[in-house]
Amino acid sequence: PKITQYHSELAQHQGLFEKYQVLKNSVEFFQLSRVRQKVVENELRDFRLGGAELSVEKKARFMQIQEELSRLYSKFEENLLDATNDFALYPTHREDLAGLPADVLDAAKEAAAQDGKPGWKLTLRAPFWMPVMQYADNRALREQMYRTYVTRASEFGNSEWDNTSLIAQILNLRQEKARLLGYANYAEVSLARNKMARSPREVLDFLHELGKEARPYAQRDFADLKRFACDELKLDTLEAWDIAYASEKLRDKYYSFSDQEVKQYFPEPQVLRGLFQLVERLYGIRIEKTETPVWHPDVLFYNIYDVGGRLIGQFYADLYSRSTKRSGAWMDEAIARRRKNGSVQIPVAYLNCNFSAPAGGRPALFTHEEVITLFHEFGHGLHHLLTSVEELGVSGINGVEWDAVELPSQFMENFCWEWDVLKNMTRHVDIVETSSIAGAASVSGIASPQETSDPPLDGAMPRVLFDKMLSAKNFQSGMQTVRQ
């Protein structure tokens, strides 16, 4: 609340607002660099969207709305996290978990042991929920976990965490906020704050056109999946909790590989080393792990140096799922680059993911999709960390419209489909353990999944497997586009 109050008061500071207005209308404004002109323009925009032009009475109401929205946003996230963490299953019969990969079972067994329970522990966190949806042969288990997942923090669960009324309050307050600022709706407010799109109608027209083009392909994909589920899996109906499971089976049929086979070639140490080597070649930088106080033992901290050995950025990497973390993957700024008192303030970023942690004595193994996610978020990080702009308000990700900020991150994803990159960032986990690359611990007695080909002597992913992945790149792309 205090932070929200500070930002609300700052956005309505009449003295500062008037100073920026005077500067914008002066001859001196046109003598500023384009970067500094952009800072002034952005500040004036933010003052207006913060209620600086409102009457005294409306300013007070606007500030109340801001503080109440902040409280509701926080409560919404807390409810979702609490509802997610409230669910846990402890199966004790191995046959109930048929189809689940060995590394998932290892992690589930360790989680149950930590709770002092026998068997395995399954939760709604991504490292458990997603493999159950994709691999579990037990349809009843898939249905139970799916229904629980999609009804979290709703009227269908524990009323203590029901977000239904919060959503209504948020929508009403946003609408009132928009009207106070002179807009017809909150969508217009959102677009006015640093977006390329000019109107909600422009956005809706784009989405409708995209949906129109993608829908026939999605319908074809879904019909193909339904036919396969009926003929091959003997499912009378294709329910929501069957889609990921049936899709994995269908892809295996078409392309003769599975995510689990691919996963064996992406142990975390090798993936990070390959990622860092790539960006070092691309940008002439050097990334080094270093020690610093962190909020959890899993968190790593890195320095970035330029070709001359000068420190230019730092970042935290918090890659594993935990009960205290919100879901998904994201990059956020801790410190932005700026020039102050003749010296440059070094930018610092947070890189957050929710990947499976190491289990069974083995390093963490990433799916190819998780590798893409890592590259995506690191692209955001590079955008923030390698900026040369030295004005705080527009350095790094702050200087780009929100509907364009995904460009650097999606650009980085492309490298995950390049053989010259992938062959240097893959190594079979058995080879990694044997050679202790990157300090991975050596273990034994854990069976590997069935593979279509043995790993090469150096352990890199076989080219034939990569070619299969490339062939399957657009598998169900119609469904994915419509879902997105």
Give short role names for the model-derived ranges.
Residues 387-413, 417:
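The catalytic-center signature of Zn2+-dependent metalloproteases
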